[in-house]
């Protein structure tokens, strides 16, 4: 996760940083490009400040912290095997796979071959939503649930990375909710389904035992702020309109429902 955000930061700062980067950063950039990441729409200075917008995470010993503990215990106890499996799937942020469950909510395939404009819109906006959480994470470095409750996360291979990456707020929640907002703009009649998927995407991080409830809630707040700020970008508005027409045309032509969707 830390490397993921570093790659987003490199992209957001543009080629001037890349030209001055060391070989390790160049290699990281190449891997992230292969994963399908693209530079966002917003310059780093234009991304809403989570430090100004969000309250600090709940203080240890506070009633809010107790609610987070209770919420964490409740969701871990209630998640069945199918929900746990979906949470593992949602943990991966590699394109094109990360868009599949959102395609199920939208009702048509999302991909470079089927809906290239929408696919690019999601790839670019992920950087804006994801980067918005980074300064807050770095400021507070809130310990993740698995470090507190002693229960393993759903992705044990990421323990060492997540151990050194702040829990508050959730980046997954930010871009999951943000994608829900974008997809609702692209296909308004699918608003309920795509927003539910965006919410569930963030909730998967609670099922994975890597985020507290308040991490996920505040990730959504930050996503809403980023989405509002994106409306001021002509390129973003144009891309949303292009994606809207593309999706409408695909649906009118009888585009098939994605395969292997959760039931």
PLM segments and residue spans:
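Bacterial N-terminal signal peptides
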Residues: 6-15
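Catalytic tyrosine of NAD(P)H-dependent dehydrogenase/reductases that use a Tyr as the general acid/base
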Residues: 7, 168, 211
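Hydrophobic alpha-helical bundle signature of multipass membrane enzymes
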Residues: 21-207, 232, 239
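Interfacial helix-loop-helix junctions of multi-pass membrane proteins
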Residues: 200-231
